[in-house]
Amino acid sequence: MQEQYNPSEIEALVQKHWHDNKTFEVTEDANKEKFYCLSMFPYPSGRLHMGHVRNYTIGDVVARFQRLQGKNVLQPIGWDSFGLPAENAAINNKTAPAPWTYENIEYMKNQLKLLGFGYDWSREIATCTPEYYRWEQWFFTKLYEKGLVYKKTASVNWCPNDETVLANEQVQDGCCWRCDTPVEQKEIPQWFIKITAYAEELLNDIDTLDGWPDQVKTMQRNWIGRSEGVEMTFGVAGHDKSFDIYTTRPDTLMGVTYVAIAAGHPLAEIAAQTNPELAAFIDECKNSTTSEAELATMEKRGVATGLFAIHPITGKQVPIWAANFVLMNYGTGAVMSVPGHDQRDFEFAKKYGLAIEAVIKPVDGDVDISEAAYTEKGVLFNSGEFDGLDFEAGFNAIANKLVAEGKGKRQVNYRLRDWGVSRQRYWGAPIPMVTLADGTVIPTPADQLPVLLPEDVVMDGIQSPIKADKEWAKTQVNGQDALRETDTFDTFMESSWYYARYCSPHADEMLDPAKANYWLPVDQYIGGIEHACMHLLYFRFFHKLLRDAGLVNSNEPAKQLLTQGMVLADAFYYINEKGARVWVSPLDVATTEKDDKGRITKAIDKDGNELVYTGMSKMSKSKNNGIDPQVMVEKYGADTVRLFMMFASPPELTLEWQESGVEGAHRFIKRLWKLANEHVNQDNSEALDASKLTSDQKALRREVHKTIAKVTDDIGRRQMFNTAVAAVMELMNHLQKAPQTTGQDNAIIGEALSAIVRLLYPIIPHVSFNLWNELGNASNIEDSQWPVVDEAALVEDSKLIVVQVNGKVRAKITVAADADKESVEALGMSDEHVIKYLDGLTVRKVIYVPGKLLSIVAN
């Protein structure tokens, strides 16, 4: 065995062994329990970052642990390789997205291999290949045939100068990123999938996701947003028109003083024909963004339409206002405004001098709405026949009256909107729909799939090549001329079913149901919580679509979900001569000074610039505080990086990158190597014989098996990898202090090292692989079994008993593990410290808690 730990040499040899022996390639085996471990696949941006490393290390730890449990473990990897960044890179580098993407895949693939992740590379997929997106296109046509796909107009960001659609990321301060032209909102036809048809099931089945974090489940419940309310019809005074409004608070209906409608509402557009101020307001709203997040914080503005709504119960007329906080594509595009009981309505009414009336008051007092709306549920008053009713009774009475008079209906609504899957970009899967010469829109026939995306293109940064090339769109279907759809799929489409394709990645069909149903559902899924409401919801939705197509037989795609925290690093900058911030990499910081609490108070970079320290923040390009994993692997080895990632923080919490911590992890591995090296050079011919052990030897062996029990629970059930590592470190401390003078001493250390290398194998697999062989094991560690606790070793010969006199600890005594109360009491009473504190007192009571405590009460 080499005396010195040499990570680069060891890791290269072990990785070659895994590659040559196809160690992690698996097939279905009905005789073995399966375990499917999956980390969210990466976008091939060019280089791995530490967030990737943390995600994939967690996944690899889980997969390797389950493998040593004897399970048939699938851990695949692939590339989420369509998307806008490739287009931007292609424009900047004067190339096409395809070669840029494929080069990045090769580079990042090598980085993943250097980190020693145990992937089944035979199942590798890239979503930008026709072999993958062909089946996505096929499935979309099947959804269309089932009535789950439709086309309607929807708003997009439009640059009038370039005459092109912009992604949200390409709109900067309301202007086009390329030409600085003010961006407009434009209505264009787009494709949608009816996720709302599954809203109830998606909501109800959240309750079955026992292995998912509560935070993610709450976020999904809120995103789906089920509400029970009433949809009612308001007439329009002086017009033969009406419009609908949905509310979850019909109990406040008698307090409506105005109605707010979206700028795009048909009534607003009618009124604008004779109202120039309103027409200008509508144009302004059309050109502003309409995300819910922005609506919540922007100034609430409106214009009176001159129209009046007729209250469905009182017949009273209330003004109709066009308002910028009402969206046409959300609900009915109109809201009843009750400023006495809704704060947004209150502020709007105050701003424009509209009436404010109170119709709800607390059960036990009066209501004051002079400064703010009263938004709690309470008792109705100023509400005519409904006075005195509480929320529930008021809700039902008003709903029943509206239903009886044909002016309303009870309704369950969802916040969830249908999924708009059209993107006016190039680098995505073409949407497989065609328009015939007579205007009929039909799916591309199956025998014409895949609709290939041309990869040999020139990006001009203005228009998608498949939109610019009029010839590309031309095709024929059943002998008729037709035009292809030139929009491409939202890239969330690819990531919604990739997990299932891994089960049969080379099948000449979307999924091989037998293989898919062997592996699915995923047993452990790992990824960031930022995906809770988009990817993870589409992921669940797609699984139900696959189920209803007869391709899978489970209801949910993943049993357990672990959402790992972000990786943070120190961030530094200086102000240059132009007054701009220049962010400096932590690796380029030459010296730092710290206060007595370890906080950085001064920092200077390699060029002598005095730096401003802004604290720990998420590793990012913008702050130049990302640490290249490859640099760390070359310096310390992959095992060290992996160990630090697992030890520095619980997996769900943020991890603070500290190179001092990396150095500590490296020192620990060297200590383990040194201990193993010393052991293999001892005479280890004597086999362990538990009957021959001294009490000290038994105590050490007890620590070994307590550690096995703890690490097994920490990794397998609790997924607290940091405490698992801490437990092994503590055991190592015991071993380093233990004597190595007798055959049984060496036998116990041999047993301990055999356990440690398997306990640490999921985390530091290269060094564990090597040490396992050096310890004299004939087979490789991948073929071994996880260490098993010897229950007999945990049995203690003696117990430490705390002795209290009148509630205060006065002594600690060691007794035989099977000692009875009388012998413990006799030993306790004879202790010199106890005798001292009982002097002059009469013992009134003695309480013995077996194995723990002897309590003496005396006065």
UniProtKB/Swiss-Prot annotation:
Residues annotated for ATP binding in this entry: 621
Keywords, in A-Z order: Aminoacyl-tRNA synthetase, ATP-binding, Cytoplasm, Ligase, Nucleotide-binding, Protein biosynthesis
CDD domains registered for this protein in UniProt: Anticodon_Ia_Leu_BEm, LeuRS_core
PROSITE patterns in alphabetical order: AA_TRNA_LIGASE_I
GO molecular function: aminoacyl-tRNA deacylase activity; ATP binding; leucine-tRNA ligase activity
Tree of life domain: Bacteria
Top EC group: ligase
Reactions this protein catalyses: tRNA(Leu) + L-leucine + ATP = L-leucyl-tRNA(Leu) + AMP + diphosphate
Chain span(s) of sequence motif 'KMSKS' region: 618-622
Gene3D superfamilies documented for this protein: 2.20.28.290, 3.10.20.590, HUPs, Isoleucyl-tRNA Synthetase, Domain 1
Enzyme Commission designation: 6.1.1.4
Residue numbers covered by motif 'HIGH' region: 42-52
Protein name: Leucine--tRNA ligase
Lineage: Bacteria, Pseudomonadati, Pseudomonadota, Gammaproteobacteria, Alteromonadales
Gene coding for it: leuS
